[in-house]
Amino acid sequence: MSEEARETPGVHNPHVIDLISLDPEANEVVLLMLEERPWGTVPNQLDQLDDKYNSYISYVLDGHLAKQPPQYADKAVRIQLDCASPPGSREQVRINAMRNFAVSERLRFRMSVIVAQDPS
């Protein structure tokens, strides 16, 4: 895999944490997964989502997040999936399973549909 491919954010790349930020209102560390492709446009899209999600779960549960800057210490963790289109029924089943697993590990999970801004 090329260096550029490893560094490209998005659900298609499980080797990258797309974004880590603080949500001061919720007092949470947010690990963002970004899916810019419409659901169902790539045959292995759900497998890619699984791989990305599992990487994020491992990053948190294996203690890698805890080694980050101190402002993340003692904060709740939310994994957030921002996607370009609403999920279909197949995708929603998978997202619900991810949410349920996250909750079982005392993590939060949120899915949001992001709407592209009209440049005009």
Predicted stretch roles:
Residues 5-21, 96-100, 104, 111-113:
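N-terminal intrinsically disordered, cationic/polar leader segments
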Residues 20-26, 68-73:
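Short glycine/proline-enriched loop/turn "hinge" motifs that connect secondary-structure elements
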Residues 44, 71-75, 90-94:
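Secreted/extracellular ectodomain signature
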Residues 1-3:
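N-terminal targeting leaders that direct proteins to extracytoplasmic destinations
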Residues 29-37, 72-85:
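Short glycine-rich, basic-tinged beta-strand/loop micro-motifs
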Residues 43-67:
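Acidic, aromatic-enriched beta-alpha/helix-loop junctions
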Residues 78-120:
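Helix-rich interaction surfaces within compact, conserved domain-sized segments
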Residues 25, 40, 116-117:
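Exposed, flexible binding/inhibitory loops of compact, secreted disulfide-stabilized domains
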